[in-house]
Amino acid sequence: MHCESPIVRRKSRQIMVGNVPVGGGAPISVQSMTNTETTDVAATVEQIRRIQTAGADIVRVSVPTMEAAEAFGLIRKQVNIPLVADIHFDYRIALRVADLGVDCLRINPGNIGREKRIKAVVDKARDLNIPIRIGVNAGSLEKDLQKKYGEPTPDALVESALRHVEILDGLNFYNFKVSVKASDIFMAVAAYRKLAALIEQPLHLGITEAGGLRAGTVKSAIGLGALLMDGIGDTIRVSLAADPVEEIKVGWDMLRSLKIRSKGVNFIACPSCSRQNFDVIKTMNDLELRVEDITVPLDVAVIGCVVNGPGEAKEADLGLAGGTPSNLIYIDGEPSQKLTNENLVDNLERLIRAKAAQKQAQLEADAKNIIARA
């Protein structure tokens, strides 16, 4: 019932964002961006920690002013996850946060200014071994490109990116990644596909300003999913008008669904119908909240009846197939025990945690054996 992923990753250079490798065959990293006032250090630190707990590899922070830059320095001292500073308009802010411990600088070609200013940022980044993201956005293209193309197009996005790739190449600076974001799915996908064939730098994927939690998730899943299935992309950010924690959850769900990278419990659940022997929807909602702290990859099937229940349950690490008078639990493909509907969620949580602990212990033992044989 399981099909191996046919995805072949695009080859790219590798950069390091803090201790996280991006590109060069490294696992695709998941990131989000804070939406607090950066000058509110306590609130921003608290949000970064929640984002990290949700599974983020990297967090971006907007730094619009010098006051925010000083706050960024205080934030940097209080968190232990790689931080990207999002810089627009004033290149001097980039120079300042570089001295304050930033792990990556995001600059926007559409508003960062003349090549002289870019060179100043590059020189500072080179001295401190800080990578840069060239972040092209359809909503803020350079004025000459707006005039040339009349409106944002995939070619306009790519031309903007290549213009700044050429500048950095000319400065013998290769420690950078690139993004070409648009809110239009077709525009973004076309731009990324074209750019992926033209450069060897790692690509940061995103559908910008995708929308609220539901619509934004759908748009991002379609756009990023298409690119990821092509093997394009080295780090992703799902842009949602929602709690940044939700961006991390959706990002991980995408990677998990495409069998690119796994973390936590992957639920396989039926949509439910009148054949269900227990309330599938309520059971799922409760379980997802209860076990979201589990990080070990684990497939759990929750199927309400005997039509597809046994088949799906056998394929999972742990599966529940609804039945009358009792539901049947499968562990590693074998029938294990029966559960009634009484305290069903409590019992399922207990079994899931036990299986996760067993799998974690096995992973650790395997890792030790590999080290011992090396």
UniProtKB/Swiss-Prot annotation:
This is 4-hydroxy-3-methylbut-2-en-1-yl diphosphate synthase (flavodoxin). Binds 1 [4Fe-4S] cluster. It catalyses: (2E)-4-hydroxy-3-methylbut-2-enyl diphosphate + oxidized [flavodoxin] + H2O + 2 H(+) = 2-C-methyl-D-erythritol 2,4-cyclic diphosphate + reduced [flavodoxin]. Converts 2C-methyl-D-erythritol 2,4-cyclodiphosphate (ME-2,4cPP) into 1-hydroxy-2-methyl-2-(E)-butenyl 4-diphosphate. PANTHER family: 4-HYDROXY-3-METHYLBUT-2-EN-1-YL DIPHOSPHATE SYNTHASE, 4-HYDROXY-3-METHYLBUT-2-EN-1-YL DIPHOSPHATE SYNTHASE (FERREDOXIN), CHLOROPLASTIC. GO terms for molecular function: 4 iron, 4 sulfur cluster binding; 4-hydroxy-3-methylbut-2-en-1-yl diphosphate synthase activity (ferredoxin); 4-hydroxy-3-methylbut-2-enyl-diphosphate synthase activity (flavodoxin); iron ion binding. It comes from the Bacteria. The gene is ispG. Belongs to the IspG family. NCBIfam families: ispG_gcpE, PRK00366.1. Disulfide bonds: none annotated. [4Fe-4S] cluster binds at C270, C273, C305, E312. It comes from Cellvibrio japonicus (strain Ueda107). SUPFAM superfamilies: Dihydropteroate synthetase-like, Nitrite and sulphite reductase 4Fe-4S domain-like. Transmembrane segments: none annotated. One of its GO terms (biological process) is isopentenyl diphosphate biosynthetic process, methylerythritol 4-phosphate pathway.
